[in-house]
Swiss-Prot record:
Molecular function as annotated in GO: toxin activity
Organism for this UniProt entry: Dinoponera quadriceps (South American ant)
UniProt comment concerning the protein's domains: The presence of a 'disulfide through disulfide knot' structurally defines this protein as a knottin.
Keyword 4Fe-4S included in the entry's annotation: no
Protein name from the UniProt record: U1-poneritoxin-Dq5a
């Protein structure tokens, strides 16, 4: 029973992380912080002066 519960919790955690990761990029003109967060802006956009361009 405990093993099954643990497996369910791990599965939920993995789903949550993968789902939030898919929607974590910022679209054009969204605020962003610094160039070290390369994944902050969506693909093809860069963080310039605090905005994704």
């Amino acid at each position: 029973m405990n093993i099954r519960l643990m497996f369910t919790l791990i599965a939920l955690l993995v789903l949550t992380v993968s789902f939030s990761g898919a929607n974590s990029c910022f679209k054009r003109n969204r605020q962003c912080k610094g160039s070290f967060l390369k994944s902050a802006c969506c693909e093809g956009l860069k963080c310039v002066n605090g905005r994704c361009t």
